[in-house]
Amino acid sequence: MKSKQILTEKSKQTPKSTPKLIIITGVPCSGKSSVSREILKNFKAMYIDKDMINDGFTLERESQFYQKIREGTYKAIDNIAGENLLYGNNVLIDGTFSTEIQNKKWFDRYAKLAKDTRSDLRLIRCIAPQELIKRRLKQRGFDKDKPKLKAFDEFLDREPIIVKWIGQLEIDTSKDFKKNIKDILKFIN
């Protein structure tokens, strides 16, 4: 059965409550995954981590192959999220979306997905001072982070911490973690 058929059939059903499409964005080591894990302790949602999907194909982040994987990953995320929302499940997506968040078309795509699945969209961006991000990258010690650390200034040029943000909530993860989570949970609900 195709997704459009499912959408038509499922849209006739009324879920008990409106599902939430929650997207957590931010540069690597901005605190997205820590925030996501804590939210999931307090809010039931299907969890999609972009890096888990990408890393199954490649750890390389600079090649044309990665760009193709990235595009396919985003399509897969959209499909998985859409199907789950149609079944009334909350969905939390954890992904950098570093260039995408500056593009209104990206926002419009998720706004349309939320509308088509009768869900509420919640966009959250994690930020932190660049010194903290650099320290977190070093502490994390992933091979995929070595090029970022080697050319940290160029990395920040490609993936700036502060951008023109078209989302809804921005959280500084260098601040009080418990308060941030409390604010996010209030925003989500």
Language-model features, listed with the residues they occupy:
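Glycine-rich phosphate-binding loop used to anchor ATP phosphates in small-molecule kinases
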Residues: G72-T117
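The conserved Walker
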Residues: P28
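Hydrophobic anchor at the beta1->P-loop junction of P-loop NTPases
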Residues: I24
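Small-molecule kinase domains that catalyze NTP-dependent phosphoryl transfer to phosphate-bearing small molecules
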Residues: Q139-D183
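Conserved substrate/cofactor phosphate-moiety recognition/catalytic segment
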Residues: S34-L86
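Conserved phosphate-donor/acceptor-positioning beta-strand/loop module used by diverse small-molecule
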Residues: K115-L137
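Extreme N-terminal, non-catalytic leader segments
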Residues: M1-P19
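Conserved glycine(s) of the Walker
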Residues: G31
